[in-house]
Amino acid sequence: MRESTPQRNKAFVLEAFETLFNKKDFVAAGKFWSPNYIQHSAHIPPGREGLFGLVKSGPRGMKYENSLIMAEGDMLMLHGRFSGLGLPANWIVVDIVRIENGFLAEHWDVIEDEVTREKSASGQPMFGEAFPS
């Protein structure tokens, strides 16, 4: 087994998210998520099947965009946006994942509705350089 590095882990996780959430290629996504995947999110059913089932049943227009990824050993944190959810607002999400034996093995998240300029107390966008329209 090759030694993992932060850069390799980042590329692995970004490819996994692209494969599942944007391409919706569930066969290929199975190569990234452990069969024993542990889910801590209150929004996602347990296990790999729970996650894949949620994505399968979600809106076809759902899209994931990443703006930041950080790695420390086998733990990674991503800051991203899910749009096209069929909800009044996009979701701004911080995902924390753990890699084990070459698979995504565990997941936690924090989810917040993306707000407009008018609703932002800070006056700063939550994702990227611009507020949603």
Model-predicted regions and their roles:
Residues 1-133:
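C-terminal and inter-domain tail/linker signature
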